[in-house]
Swiss-Prot record:
This is Phenylalanine--tRNA ligase beta subunit. Mg(2+) binds at D348, D354, D357, D358. It is an enzyme of class 6 (ligase). Its EC number is 6.1.1.20. Belongs to the phenylalanyl-tRNA synthetase beta subunit family. Type 2 subfamily. InterPro entries: aa-tRNA-synth_II/BPL/LPL, B3/B4_tRNA-bd, DNA-bd_dom_put_sf, Phe-tRNA-ligase_IIc_bsu, Phe-tRNA-synth_IIc_bsu_arc_euk, Phe-tRNA_synthase-like_B3/B4, Phe_tRNA_ligase_beta2_arc, PheRS_beta_core. The gene is pheT. Tetramer of two alpha and two beta subunits. One of its GO terms (molecular function) is phenylalanine-tRNA ligase activity. Its main location: cytoplasm. Its cofactor is Mg(2+). Residues 292-370 form the B5 domain. GO terms for cellular component: phenylalanine-tRNA ligase complex. PANTHER family: PHENYLALANINE--TRNA LIGASE BETA SUBUNIT, PHENYLALANYL-TRNA SYNTHETASE BETA CHAIN AND LEUCINE-RICH REPEAT-CONTAINING PROTEIN 47.
Amino acid sequence: MPVVDIDTDELRGLTGRTDTSDEEFKEDLFGLGLEFEGETDEDLLQFEFAPDRLDRLSVEGVARSLRYHYGDDRGVYVPETNDPEWTIEVDESVPDERPYVTGAVIRGVDLDEGALDSLIQLQEKLHATMGRGRAKGAIGIHDLAMVKGAPLQEGSEPSITYRGVDPDGVSFVPLDANDELTPNEVLAEHDTGQTYADLVEGLDRYPAIYDELGLFSFPPVINGKRTEVTTGSRELFVELTGTDQWTIDRMCNIVCYALSARGATIEQVEVNYADGATAPSEYGAELVRPNFDTDEKSVSHDRIETLLGVDFEPEEIVDCFERAGLDASYTLDEDVTYEVEIPPYRVDVLHPLDLVDDVGRAYGFDNLEPRYPDVGTVGGRHERSRLEDAVRTSLVGLGFEDLLNFHMTSGTENYDRMNLEAGSDAFGGGNPVEITEPYSEEYTQLRTWAIPSLVMLLERNTHNAYPQDVAEVGFAAERDDSENTNVAERRHVAGAVARRDASYEAAKGRLQAVCDDFRAELETPRTEHPSFIDGRTAAVVIDGEVVGVIGEVHPAVLVEHDLEVPVAAFEFHLDALR
């Protein structure tokens, strides 16, 4: 869980609550979901919070939430932006592994030591969370006075360039250094370069940002010393690069909102992707950023009342939304429905339940009255839950390591890297349940089978000793028009054996032992499956019903996952053991 350091003197200044004590702040923030963790040596208060509210990674974001909580602010706030005076030109030489860029110009910012520390903390916390350790998105913040833009043509606005460079063909002075280094030398000799070297290693060209004077940023590794931000900086240039345009745009919004809270003016920049550059398909080749357009979600009145257990008037719910920093209107049809406007720094509102949570926090969870449900039964474990544990115990007894993998995946992992085609008749090849608005390209659908999850885990553990025998009892789903929900949800049992002598017989022996434990009759007639080797693949038939597949993983799949040892695997439906 993310932990943010808060200077309460800064918090008092940003909220206007100069008489509020530290203890009162702790209590108020607990009501917002931030739990006090302790104090630093510098007497800063540390708060832990759920990682969904990334806008609270700075004292400015926490202060904004408190101002809404106190009723000092209401509804959606969108900072005014000035028209672009700077352009970011994206060259076709940018490496495909990090193709996207965004940015903003900040003017009139007043950075004392506290504000600068907060900005650096926000930058690093966003790197660690939304930026996935800078792999998905990285932020560079520069003193604009030290950036010299070169107009592309006479009379045009100044521009900088995002391009790919030869790792040994250019040099610059990085932060915390005095001598010029090439990008490769930064990775080898600089402490920060060594920390993030794995993000660019293996690339033919490294990402770099240039102005008229030369390279001043080597994302996602380090900035140049020339544009270092200090307490004397009054105008800033913020640039973000990454693998997903949506992610870096939202990270940029959070940074801009934090600086706006300090009285800064936000100026947009133009982002132009050149012919041959990888432009974001959903936005086009010419962007204006930051984009402060609001989003909209809807939620029904009945859903809010049912989940919170409180009878509300529509006006009360609108009031709660406004005190949560949202705007809402409603329609009086058979069921009252609220159309809710969401500000651009709220990256956590993905589902109507997130809106219900906002209403609950604005109303005050302390004000909810607990009551026992009117149920005349005694609770107990479901039969399937007991079966799952029994199967896990059996697998562990056979030498498997029990796993719990993500149920979300992508088409690339579920199908492409497994040599499987979506919609095929092969086990695991069913049509997937896809996410309408995926938060990440890595999680766009529910998995249709579990073996890809096991193979991915083996891929991440090639540095560990063999044998590696892993298994999972987990969830899988696929589209099925015969179901009332159009989705068939099942629990699957999967196991994989990775070792020098892994074979069909080794996997079959483990599978037979599991079936024997549950007195199930196992048959394994020969079959074909694109993820497995022909002639070394069989269907799993339990008590006369085809419920899975077993075999030696195809060499093409092993190569795709950089596995240098054979792998044999099996998977079947859990309910077959009932």
